[in-house]
Amino acid sequence: MSQILSASSRLKPVNLHGADSETCTMVFKNHWNQVQRILESHDPFKNTQAKYRSISADEVSAVQNYVEHMLMLLIEEEVTDAAMGPILEYVVSENIMEKLFLWSLRREFTDETKYEQLKMYELLVTQSHQPLLHHKPILKPLMMLLSACSGTSTAVVETKLAVLLNQLCSILAKDPSILELFFHTSEDQGAANFLIFSLLIPFIHREGTVGQQARDALLFIMSLSAENNVVAKHIVEGTFFCPVLATGLSGLYSSLPTKLDDKGEDWHCLLKEDCLQIPELIQFQNSLEFCNAVIQVAHPLIRAQLVDYIFNGFLLPVVAPALHKVTVEEVMTTTAYLDLFLRSVSEPTLLKIFLRFILIHQHEKVHILDTLVSRINTPFRLCVVSLALFRTLIGLHCEDVMLQLILRYLIPCNHVMVTQRSAVREQDCYSACAEKFLSLTPECCALTVSSTGYLERRQTMYSKFRQRTDSDDSKHLYEKDTLMDGDCAEPVDDNYLEYLWEAHENILNCLEDCKVWSAPYDGQNPDPEISLKALMEDNCRRGEFPTFRRATRHYMDSFSSETPSLGGKTLLDLEWDDSYDTGMSPDSGSCSPQPSIDAVLPPEPPHHIQEMKRNAIMFIKGSYIEESDFQDDVMVYRLCAVKDAKDADMQNITDKNDIETNDQFTKPQEGNQTQANYNKNANLNEDTVKTQVKQTLPKVKIQLSPAADDISNMNTLSPDSEEFIARYDDMLNGLKTSTLEDVISPIHSLASPMEEDEDEFDKYSLDLPQAESIPSPFGPRDATIFSNFLPRPQTAPFTGPFISVVLSKLENMLENSLHVNLLLIGIITQLATYPQPLIRSFLLNTNIVFQPSVRSLYQVLASVKQKIEQLAATQQNFPVLLVEAQRYLLCRMDMPNQSADTFTKDNIAANTERKPAAAAAEAPRGVVQKAKEHRANPLLPLSGESKHIQNAMLAAALFPEFLKELAALAQEHSVLHSFHH
Amino acid sequence: MNPFWNMSSAAVRKRSDNDEKIATGDQKISPPRSSSAKKQLPSIPKNAVPITKPISPSPSVQPTNGTHASYGPFYLEYSLLAEFTLVVKQKLPGVYVQPSYRSALMWFGVIFIRHGLYQDGVFKFTVYIPDNYPDGECPRLVFDVPVFHPLVDPVSGELDVKRAFTKWRRNHNHIWQVLMYARRIFYKIDTTSPLNPEAAVLYEKDVQLFKSKVVDSVKLCNSHLFDQPKIEDPYAIIFSPWNPVLHDDARERMLAQKKSEEQSKGLHVSGLSWVKPGSVLPFSKEENSLQT
């Protein structure tokens, strides 16, 4: 080692500028002669004694000294024209470098020797005044050295190797003409291979500077490959670059912690500072970012291969199972990781496979998207983490995301009254919708706190507007200026201008991003009729009916919200995975005119879902509950049978169905086990039973043959069969209320023994209002009346699981914790920013008339308003508590925005400067953490008796702000629409 | 008080006579659709409608609380902004408007007449919008120089807008229609119940004399083109003679901007979409970049 150190210290450039070229060459040749003498004395070909003589230390150091000096001379040699300098020419013609390499091989080829040699080449390559790598006598020994180093394991050598490789690659990047040489020097040893590249691959996932150097070096080559088909082809066909990169991700992922430390109550996504605390995560992120960078610069062939490997080698085998782990905790962690990855990836090609994975991949026959949506409805932290993931997804402004999440349910326009179709495109010329949103402000919330920062903020807003006016030609902006000159803003308007400003910016951003979308989504394009067909075919292929789910779910949603729930009851909303049990699983497609085998025999809910449910229940109750506690499902089957029998009578379909129902009654196994499975955990109430009843409905129609569970049956009834639809409608119409009551009333009597049966689970479910709220399980009958206007199959209008779960969650605003509400508000305002008339009209047009079974945002907000007013009427010192809550929120707002780095992408990061509702939605994190740190801070603590009241008060304080945001968005849409084409 | 509100009332001169007797061309401009379309919907079954949602929105919702009322200026402002965007969208040939700096209720405009009797006429005008828009009367349009025309008041220069919009109906009538009407009177001359009887009579009886009077009027208007604007306002429309130093450059920039916009189209891709046009399925777009 001392040798190495001395070597590097002595190799300081000597000032040779004084010496003339001729002298230098003389000195060089002289030195070489000295060296050569020593070399030859040990060369077995030239000296027969050589093999018996050992190399003395003196000889070694003599050679070393000469060589060092020679290298200095070579490095310092300068030439004016393109020709080689005399020293270089001598080096090349005498093949000096190769001879030196062989000499070092002849000695013991230790790590120290390797280090020396690597160092020597590094100096040559980086310091030399003339290009050296073009010359094979220099390149070849270098290659030999590199390949000799490939198996090495010493950290010192590895570091040096990485540095040299990095240097070589950067030279390559600057001078691609050398590439050819690099490629073919090794041809002598066999197949063409790209040695520097292969040597770099093992370092890809290395941590620390070595890994960084190697990755940088690889990026040089990647950008080279973009221009060079040969290199690209070689990398794709001749190296394991892509597989190593992708499977490396899997390896690194598996070392990530499966559970995260408790990060505080309102933690919902991984921020930069979270990542920094987990070294494994840093390493993973490095590799992911490297993949991103490779995809950014590499040749399309490499890009395609890498993306393919990441999909098939990382997402499918690793992330998918991780998303379906057994414990809520693990699933939550995976969701948070996935969210982080989505935010870290910026290359569209890479993002695309992540989105493809989330949007259309199925795990155990269930779409990952559906699973993720259903998790919003859990009472755990998993809910907020899932919401955060969706916030990220929606913030991408990606057409495919919006299509799967929302638009596919809106395109058929089933959600609007037929006469209102054209209203989808209508603009709200006179701010009528904004007015309606604002009119939902509960009177009890009208008073506002004046905060100290308020005046300043207003000032900055004003100046911002003014600046904008000067610089921007958009015609209308100065009018805002006018408005402000008027100083007409009363206290209540204080931040409304900010909301308008932000809405303006956000809509413009979104408009810009949506320019690449394939269609305007205005209710005409894509054509509702044609698209409906395409979507139905797709659904068929997917084996489910997401477009036409039952309306019942909406009623369930409204039930839970209509529950007067502020009476201090336990409010554990254990609506676990409703969507799985009712709305989302394929068997719920019973409203669909498309019969399928799935409608007959619901598939087993995926194993992990059942597992999770069980876990969830344990979690909630803090103790394990025997599964058998939920096994009493015979009753349900009896009900199904009764119902089936009734239906059978109605339809005059006799024997076969009897057999079928008997079958079902007596042999509740296999497929029926599923029903058992979801009933055992579901709240056993009318809804569930209705679900059952409803699910049995299609059987009457479909099970024309006992072999109904035969797949082939699927084809016997065409989805578009007019006759089938007609009969289906008839049947629906035939089921008047009386029939329903007949069906439902026995449920009560049957259900009562169940309640006595120590079904503890019931205690955790919500008390549902009994008589008044029993809706027709088939959706309002009138829907079928309207259906007569439709030239196509009428289906229960359904705006999709996502909308429905988000709105139902929103309706429970007063029971939600602050961060759930902030996320919900964030998501809804993000959605309301989209300029597509279908989305805009659904969320913001308060005048449009929807189908009765469709619940609109306005209706949900109206219900929240009502609840707030109820609260105000019953809650003592409501005004005091409200002011406190407002102060609390203002405090959060004034805190420095710690999570500006939450979003790594520009389009989202642009929105960091925000105000009350939105600001908190983005940056809820730091605030409560700070609140914990400074418990003494007199402003922060809320004095509500319970967490429950505190949440309600915070929601009440947020609500008016949310309304302002929506109103502002509605107003800006009316002005900005013309920019959208 | 807010000048936003005062401005218009100060600027608008009251007109005493309303020509309500005149039948209008209203119908052609905006075919009367039933304004109560929403009410004619099939009645929604009671059990399906949440209590909170009003079944039919009443046209003039009275603000129920104080909070609500203070947003009035915003609603008016945005209504006018929306109107303005509609005007921009219409791209009426030869018609240009610009809201004033001081009030969104006052718009400056100019009409270029490119053929017909009034060919080469450049008529500046001002539009005054009532402050209870859109529930008030129709906007007024006053030419800076009274044009010789049967429907233009020879003294005040005001155009008879009312005959086209007997009653201003929100959602059906828009300001761009007023502007379109103002343009049309120069191409299709109507002489019934004129504000300028002389012009009307001449047009009926002696077209030649009418024509020459029109030519004089156009000349007069054009001679006042470079006058200072009648109403002093930073956004008033001002004409000045062509100044190569100033205008050549500006003109070039305007043309260049248009070109560069066209060029940059398609190059700048910031959004995300893998949906094939015409498809409603995600990731339906073929990846053609791979086959390079």
From Swiss-Prot, chain B:
**What GO terms fall under cellular component here?**
FHF complex; plasma membrane
Q: Which CDD domains match?
A: UEV_AKTIP
Membrane topology reported for the UniProt record: Peripheral membrane protein
Gene3D superfamilies from the xrefs?
Ubiquitin Conjugating Enzyme
Q: Where in the cell is it found?
A: Cytoplasm; Cell membrane
Q: Where is this region: Disordered?
A: 1-64, 273-292
Q: What family, per the record?
A: Belongs to the ubiquitin-conjugating enzyme family. FTS subfamily.
Q: What is the name attached to this protein's record?
A: AKT-interacting protein
